[in-house]
Each structure stands twice: as C-alpha cells, then as structure tokens.
C-alpha cells in the first residue's frame, strides 16, 4: 500500500462466515492489520499544489497528526450488515489507541460517494459470494471503492475470487462501464483486479 499501488489481500483457511455480508472472521484479520498499522506510527507523504495544479512542496506528516476534515482511514463495505461490524471494529481501535474522532471511519460504499480519505481499506464486494449479482458486481460500486483514497487502497477478501469469476456465466454487453446496454461483471472485475498487487494469507 505504501507504494501507492492498490493491493488485494485474499485470506484462506478462515472459518465459515455467517453470511457473505456478516464475516467476522475476515474482519478479525483486517482488524489485526489495522492494529499493526496504527501501532507502527506511519507517516503520510504528500505534495501541495497551487491554484493551477502545479506541484509545490513535499510534505511529511505522522499519520496520527494529520489535520483536515478527511479521515486518515476509511473502512468500506458493500452491505449494511458488514458495516455494522466495521463500526464496532473502528470503535475498538479508536478507544485502544486514543484516536481523534473521525481519524478512522466506517461506511457503506454507497454512502461514501464523493468523500475522500488518505487510506481506503475495503472488503471486496464479491468476498464470500456464491456468484456475481446485480448488487455485488455493480461497476459503479467497485469504482467508488477504488477511487476514494489519496494515498493507498487495500481490498480484503476471502480466497477464491478468481474461481468465482471463472465460474460466473457470461453476460453480453460492454466492459468497464463503456456505452452499451449491459455491463459485464466478470470482465470488469478481472480487468480491475489485474491492476492490483496481490497477496494471500493462510490462517
């Protein structure tokens, strides 16, 4: 994430989830990563720009001292039930580390449209799903997930995204939201995942 390249972490060996959108085992892995990230006292490197978008000076700020209205970390999930668990996780992290109010937040992807944050940590919308459907494979929802962060993006998912997409039925249409009558969930998700650095953790 520190390089600015989006990263997908797939986690294998987890206990079964209660449902695709109620996955406490996966969120427990995510919470451990966030715990380490906050404890490491990372710094945020940036640039200031003039009114014409010309880069000015470089800045380096400890993440815990970052100022402004935007949160440093936004934890995003697709469905409301998953966000309820993410809210609880954010509350625990905030209390344990004495974080400023709003330093780390949780939200549904839909509610986070138009917002920005330093680092996005999101549960992939297809994680744990039996297959793509109109809701979890929507291109716009994935686009929001991938474009809210100014510095880094980490998607987490249960293992098996490639297999899920391989087994998804073909749908006629055009990929990546190009003009056409139907979007192609399988091709769209594959193209986007090809841009990610990928890692697998076995628990």
Across the structure, where does each feature detected by a protein language model lie?
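Active-site lining segments that contact anionic ligands and/or coordinate catalytic metals
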Residues: 3-6, 70, 116-119, 150-151
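Conserved helicase/translocase motor-coupling segment
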Residues: 1-91
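Conserved beta-strand segments of the P-loop GTPase G domain that flank and frequently precede/overlap
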Residues: 10, 76-78, 122-125, 155-157
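A short beta-strand element within the Helicase C-terminal
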Residues: 107, 113-128, 143-144, 152-155
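Conserved nucleotide-binding/hydrolysis micro-motifs of P-loop NTPases
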Residues: 80-83, 112, 126-128, 150, ...
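Helicase C-terminal subdomain and adjacent C-terminal extension
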Residues: 1, 94-96, 131-203
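Amphipathic coiled-coil/heptad-repeat helices and related helical stalk/stem segments
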Residues: 26, 30, 105, 138-141
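Conserved RecA-like helicase motor-core motifs
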Residues: 74, 92-108
């Amino acid at each position: 994430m520190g390089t600015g390249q989006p990263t997908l972490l797939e986690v294998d060996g987890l206990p079964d989830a209660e449902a695709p959108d109620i996955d406490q085992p996966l969120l427990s892995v995510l919470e451990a990563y966030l715990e380490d990230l906050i404890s490491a006292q990372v710094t945020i490197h940036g640039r200031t720009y003039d009114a014409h978008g010309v880069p000015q000076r470089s800045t380096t700020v400890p993440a815990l001292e970052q100022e402004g209205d935007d949160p440093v970390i936004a934890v995003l999930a697709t469905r409301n039930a998953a966000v309820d668990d993410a809210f609880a996780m954010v509350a625990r992290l905030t209390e344990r580390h004495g974080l400023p109010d709003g330093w780390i937040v949780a939200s549904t992807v839909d509610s986070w449209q138009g917002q920005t944050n330093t680092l996005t940590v999101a549960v992939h919308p297809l994680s744990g799903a039996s297959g793509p459907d109109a809701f979890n494979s929507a291109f716009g929802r994935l686009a929001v997930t991938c474009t809210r962060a100014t510095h880094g993006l980490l998607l987490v998912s249960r293992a098996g995204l490639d297999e899920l997409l391989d087994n998804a039925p073909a749908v006629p249409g055009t990929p990546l939201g190009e003009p056409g009558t139907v979007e192609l969930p399988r091709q769209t998700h594959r193209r986007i995942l090809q841009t990610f650095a990928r890692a697998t953790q076995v628990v």
